[in-house]
UniProtKB/Swiss-Prot annotation:
One of its GO terms (molecular function) is transmembrane transporter activity. This is Energy-coupling factor transporter transmembrane protein EcfT. The gene is ecfT. Keywords: Cell membrane, Membrane, Transmembrane, Transmembrane helix, Transport. The lineage of its organism: Bacteria, Bacillati, Bacillota, Bacilli, Lactobacillales. Belongs to the energy-coupling factor EcfT family. It holds the Pfam family CbiQ. It comes from Lacticaseibacillus paracasei (strain ATCC 334 / BCRC 17002 / CCUG 31169 / CIP 107868 / KCTC 3260 / NRRL B-441) (Lactobacillus paracasei).
């Protein structure tokens, strides 16, 4: 559970850290969108190099990004296997019944794997280089136009902020409960998949109790401090775009142009 990086922030003063959170949020979603435009080895290689360059600019060790892949590795491998066995085309390397391993299947599987890794790396970069509070402020700022149709933007941003803030806390609490149960002789890795799922069930009740207790304490603390929601709240930090944000936007456009040129 402690491998999950969602909601964790690594302090720093890198070029990526100093970008406006709105720029990072928009760039991340834009990047995830253009990843699906890649359709050959040249485009995927270019996207991979661009991603490594952004990681280098952030000053965050690559090990953190590899940790972000680990919790999803089985989902990635399952998707890759489906592509390999069910996509047909090109040279047939193996065939048994309705299962095939073909040239196109292997290529598709490799592309799916790289695509997953790139998306996870970019999502991890956004999380590790942006404080949850700044990310919530960015969402609130970008959703401001929805206030015209009476969407509670401030409340939605608060919910996002609390969720991002307490995901690491919840994961740490889960790890503590698992360690306590291991000390009592519980082996979460023993037996088949159904036995392992059964072993996880005793975690749920103390985890739910801990979550509700934390939520109640947070609500009490907010009431004690006189918190009032609404659009009339002021902010200490005002978001402003700087030259580096426009440079980042230009870089994404250049990346898109190169991607379109290299597409098969």
């Amino acid at each position: 559970m402690d491998k999950l990086l969602l909601g964790r922030y690594i302090p720093g003063d890198s070029w990526v850290h100093r970008l406006d959170p709105r720029t990072k949020l928009i760039a991340s979603f834009y990047y995830i969108g253009i990843v699906f435009l890649a359709n050959n080895w040249q485009t995927y290689l270019m996207m991979f190099v661009a991603t490594l360059f952004m990681i280098w600019l952030s000053g965050i060790k690559i090990g953190f990004f590899l940790k972000g892949v680990r919790p999803l590795i089985w989902l990635i491998l399952f998707t890759v296997v489906l592509q390999v066995l069910f996509v047909r085309g090109g040279t047939v390397y193996w065939h048994w019944g309705w299962l095939w391993i073909t040239e196109f299947g292997l290529i598709n599987g490799a592309f799916i794997f790289v695509r997953f890794v790139l998306i996870i790396f970019m999502s991890t970069l956004l999380t590790l280089s942006t404080q949850p509070l700044s990310l919530a402020d960015a969402v609130e700022s970008l959703l401001k136009p929805l206030r015209v149709i009476r969407v509670p933007v401030t409340e939605l941003a608060l919910v996002l902020q609390i969720a991002l803030r307490f995901v690491p806390t919840l994961m740490d609490q889960t790890t503590k409960i698992m360690n306590a149960q291991r000390a009592r002789g519980v082996d979460f890795g023993e037996g088949n998949i159904f036995q392992q799922m059964k072993a996880v069930v005793p975690l749920l009740i103390p985890l739910f109790v801990s979550s509700f207790t934390t939520a109640d304490e947070l609500a009490t603390a907010m009431e004690a401090r006189g918190y009032q929601g609404g659009d009339d709240r002021t902010k200490y930090r005002i978001l402003r775009y700087h030259r580096r944000d426009w440079v980042a936007a230009g870089g994404m456009l250049v990346l898109t142009g190169l991607l379109l040129l290299l597409r098969a």
